């Protein structure tokens, strides 16, 4: 994970307090190349629904990973994350913990959670 992109994720998370932040990590050949801020349509400290302008989303041609923050919990998928995985099932799923200043990556598929290495 390039340090400038990690810092953009952390900065966005801090700015959205007390709510969770969310966004997209754009990937080229499996490597992070850009962080795109999105809106948490739930405006909640406990859950998120990612909203990105549909026109902006349609312009993205790279692979995508979802990113969201946990305000006080560790950067591990919560039960809510697993139950609401939706279209992110099987894709890289990154969580930034504001309280711990930690970023971790996972895949969630059919209720199974597997860690991913951040490059």
Q: What positions do the PLM features span?
A:
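Extracytoplasmic ligand/sensor domains, especially the bilobed periplasmic-binding protein
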Residues: 69
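Conserved beta-strand-loop surface patch within small alpha/beta domains used
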Residues: 1-63, 72-119
């Amino acid at each position: 994970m390039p340090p400038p992109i990690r810092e953009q994720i952390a900065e966005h998370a801090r700015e959205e307090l007390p709510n969770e932040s969310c966004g997209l990590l754009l990937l080229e050949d499996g490597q992070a190349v850009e962080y795109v801020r999105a809106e948490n349509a739930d405006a909640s400290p406990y859950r998120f629904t990612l909203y990105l302008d549909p026109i902006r989303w349609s312009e993205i041609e790279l692979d995508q990973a979802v990113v969201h923050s946990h305000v006080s919990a560790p950067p591990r998928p919560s039960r809510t994350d697993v139950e609401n995985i939706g279209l992110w099932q099987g894709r890289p799923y990154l969580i930034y913990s504001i309280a711990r200043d930690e970023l971790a990556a996972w895949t969630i598929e059919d209720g199974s959670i597997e860690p991913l290495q951040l490059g």
